[in-house]
Design a protein with these regions (language model features):
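Conserved amphipathic alpha-helix within the SDR
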Residues: 1-8
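Residue(s) in the substrate-gating loop at a strand-loop-helix junction
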Residues: 68
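Substrate-binding pocket helix/loop in short-chain dehydrogenase/reductase
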Residues: 24-25, 29-34
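Active-site helix of classical SDR
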Residues: 48, 84
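Active-site-adjacent segment of SDR/Rossmann-fold oxidoreductases
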Residues: 73, 94-105
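C-terminal helical subdomain
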Residues: 108, 128-166
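Conserved NAD(P)H cofactor-binding loop of Rossmann-fold oxidoreductase domains
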Residues: 17-21
Length: 189
């Protein structure tokens, strides 16, 4: 409400809050798993819920959620983070369909690992094996593109960010589940 009073309108919301704990599931405190789910999922729910009345009034309205390539297939050593990003993916899909009647598109971006403080010193093998090549600016560029793009029936709800994430996302659509599992087992060793 304060922002709308200042700016006059809210027509784009970017949900970007998130935390990550890495390590074997059983060695991570249950409170860390709960905190990850709470912040990463409830932050998106809260942002969407609070913004809806204002977005409904806008001529052009869009929500961009920061999901993750970890929502393509569950990741060892990042279990609660991956689960939270699957939830963001589900929220994005559900609201994109539900809020079409208001003219609101709900989209996401799904980057692989990004060069931020969040992934420094992380122990997950998939981070070590895949590397951290994206910058915050790379992701911001994709968020901006999603925010201002003309809406067409061909505008995909999800956009993988980075060559590796795009490849994994496309392969996950066409490859058998056992192959997805074997690929992730390989990446997590």
């Amino acid at each position: 409400a304060e922002f709308v009073t200042w700016a006059g309108e809210l027509n784009i919301l970017v949900n970007n809050a998130g935390i990550l704990f890495s390590g074997p599931f059983e060695q991570t405190e249950i409170s860390a798993h709960h905190k990850t789910m709470s912040i990463n999922v409830n932050g998106v729910l809260n942002g969407c819920h609070a913004a809806l009345p204002y977005l409904k009034q806008a001529n052009f309205a869009r929500i961009i959620n920061l999901s993750s390539a970890s929502a393509i297939y569950g990741q060892a050593d990042l279990v609660s983070y991956s689960a939270s990003k699957f939830a963001v993916r589900g929220i994005t899909e559900g609201l994109d369909t539900e809020w079409q009647k208001y003219g609101i598109r709900v989209l996401d971006v799904m980057p692989l690992f990004v060069q931020t403080a969040m992934v420094q010193d992380m122990q997950a093998k998939s981070i070590q094996n895949m590397g951290v090549h994206l910058t915050a600016e790379d992701v911001a560029h994709h968020v901006f593109q999603r925010a201002v793009a003309k809406d067409t029936a061909l505008t995909a709800t999800h956009q993988a960010v980075g060559a590796k994430a795009k490849l994994l996302f496309q392969l996950s659509k066409i490859s058998p589940q056992f192959l997805n599992r074997l690929t992730n087992l390989y990446l997590s060793k």
